[in-house]
Amino acid sequence: MRYTIKNEYLKVTVDSKGCEIVSAITAADNREHIWQADPAAWKRHAPVLFPLVGKYRDNSVTYNGRQYHMTQHGFARDMEFEPVKIEDDKLTMCLKADASTLEAYPFFFKLECTYRLDGSSIAASWRVSDTQDEAMYFSIGAHPAFVLDGHESLTGCRIGFAMDRYGVEAVNPDTKAEGISYRLLNAEGLSLIHI
């Protein structure tokens, strides 16, 4: 099911499958800003990545002696979220652990995703709760794709982040990440590929 929130600047549509933004249209010019999921290039719009960002080696991990299988970027993007609160300019949806998630991920969780319109911006927030009293390991992220109308060439384009430092640090600085075969960010910024 799809839900729409709007204000005087934006109209945003979110699909309950994956709690994925599938459309963001500006009121002033009726322009779509979200990639419209052409399967020839990429079938998604703006998936929520949980409980894994990236992938496990061989798509599996062992935890407490049991092996769990999970594909790249986790399962949330392919699951049905339930609406929690729907307002004109704000939507909160929820995904909870169930028998199918426990086959891939050994933790009882509750993931709440909220999209709130703030003027001409979309504020996204996630709240992950451990519904049992044990350490819960996870990662979470977003993978939005945008429409770049009017750009014949992206030569010279770059995306910058207004941060003095990145907010992610190594859990154990003495270990080395394995299985990563490319760098997306470098001194020049984020690489863009025009398809």
Regions found by a protein language model. Name each.
Residues 10-14, 113-115, 159:
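Broad, structure-driven detector of short, well-ordered beta-strand segments within folded domains
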Residues 6-8, 18, 55, 75-78, ...:
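Residues that act as N-cap/strand-start positions at coil-to-secondary-structure junctions
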Residues 1-63, 67-71:
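Beta-strand-rich N-terminal accessory domains
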Residues 66, 70-119:
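Extended, loop-rich substrate-binding clefts of extracytoplasmic carbohydrate-active enzymes
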Residues 137, 145-193:
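Active-site/ligand-binding surface loops and adjacent short beta/alpha elements
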Residues 1-6, 98, 110, 190-192:
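Beta-strand-rich recognition/accessory modules
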